[in-house]
């Protein structure tokens, strides 16, 4: 959700197709891993990753994104894809091509008992709670604060907002940096679960785009619901499809085909949403 929220803010408000958003996620994971190795503090790792990637976001917005905003979406796709290639090469130069280890906090390494017969990993539960809290905070920021009103005003009518004294370029810089920091936090939190490696941003970017399309571009609520639906469909598919396929095919075939069909189910869900709600389930208004 954090990655989808950052990207939907940038695309929905700034009208920038930023394929390099996954590279910011990757940068956050690598910085967090490096900080964790040096300090041993996971909290410091997350904070340093967010700040460092936020600084990268400032540089990227001032040097490239601000210029790409004046171009069409094709130029934006090509320009930000070039950033992906550069980021991957920089990561290889600094950390090497091998995956980097990022350990989760020792206090959250075990399970917690949710029900008498149900144990759940404490770290994953923390991520869920953090994601829900972040969703509520972002929704409140965009819809209930003066800064959020200014952001939406700048997105709706830039010229009118400028005439009213709003510094739209500075406002959009803040939105882009916020998106970069959200991606970095997501990378730091998911690093202990997934492998911190070169190209990890591209792997998750497709799913993030699916979440945004399902939920509605520019909508925080839509990004949250889209991420929730994608996660539920993927998890349910991986859990139940192999069981169903074993009724027809051999266990080996069912185990290999089931996860593939679960991934396909995500895109079937997206297609169904686009047929009945072309703007997504919760499109941004105004």
Predicted region positions:
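Transmembrane alpha-helical segments in multi-pass inner-membrane proteins
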Residues: 40-51, 173-183, 187-188, 193-267
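Alpha-helical transmembrane segments within multi-pass membrane transporters and channels
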Residues: 40-84, 90, 225-230, 234, ...
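Helix-loop-helix "hairpin" substructures at the membrane interface of multi-pass membrane proteins
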Residues: 117-199, 220-226
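Transmembrane helix-bundle core of multi-pass membrane transporters
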Residues: 67-68, 73-144, 171, 236-265, ...
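Alpha-helical transmembrane segments of polytopic integral membrane proteins
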Residues: 4-13, 32, 56-62, 83, ...
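Hydrophobic core segments of alpha-helical transmembrane domains in multi-pass membrane transport
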Residues: 29-33, 50-56, 83-91, 130-139, ...
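Membrane-embedded helix boundary and interhelical linker motif in transport proteins
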Residues: 13-59, 63, 240, 244-254
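Single transmembrane alpha-helix segments in multi-pass membrane proteins
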Residues: 1-35, 61-75, 159, 212-221, ...
């Amino acid at each position: 959700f954090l990655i989808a929220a950052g990207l939907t803010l940038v695309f929905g408000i700034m009208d920038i197709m930023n394929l390099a958003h996954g590279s910011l996620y990757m940068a956050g994971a690598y910085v967090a891993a490096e900080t964790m190795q040096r300090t041993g503090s996971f909290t410091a790792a997350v904070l340093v990753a967010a700040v460092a990637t936020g600084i990268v976001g400032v540089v990227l917005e001032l040097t490239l994104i601000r210029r790409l905003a004046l171009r069409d979406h094709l130029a934006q796709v090509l320009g930000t894809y070039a950033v992906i290639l550069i980021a991957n090469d920089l990561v290889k130069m600094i950390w090497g091509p091998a995956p980097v280890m990022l350990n989760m906090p020792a206090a959250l390494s075990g399970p917690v008992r949710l029900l008498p017969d149900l144990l759940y990993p404490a770290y994953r539960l923390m991520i869920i709670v953090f994601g829900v809290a972040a969703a509520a905070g972002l929704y409140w920021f965009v819809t209930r604060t003066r800064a959020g009103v200014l952001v939406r005003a700048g997105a709706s009518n830039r010229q009118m907002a400028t005439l009213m004294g709003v510094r739209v370029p500075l406002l959009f810089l803040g939105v882009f940096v916020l998106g970069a920091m959200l991606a970095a936090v997501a990378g730091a939190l998911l690093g202990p679960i997934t492998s911190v490696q070169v190209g990890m941003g591209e792997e998750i970017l497709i799913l993030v785009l699916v979440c945004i399309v399902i939920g509605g571009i520019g909508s925080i609520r839509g990004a949250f619901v889209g991420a929730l639906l994608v996660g539920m469909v993927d998890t349910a598919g991986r859990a139940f499809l192999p069981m169903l396929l074993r009724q027809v095919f051999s266990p080996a075939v069912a185990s290999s085909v089931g996860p593939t069909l679960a991934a396909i189910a995500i895109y079937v869900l997206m297609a169904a949403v686009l047929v009945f709600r072309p703007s997504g389930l919760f499109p941004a208004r105004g």
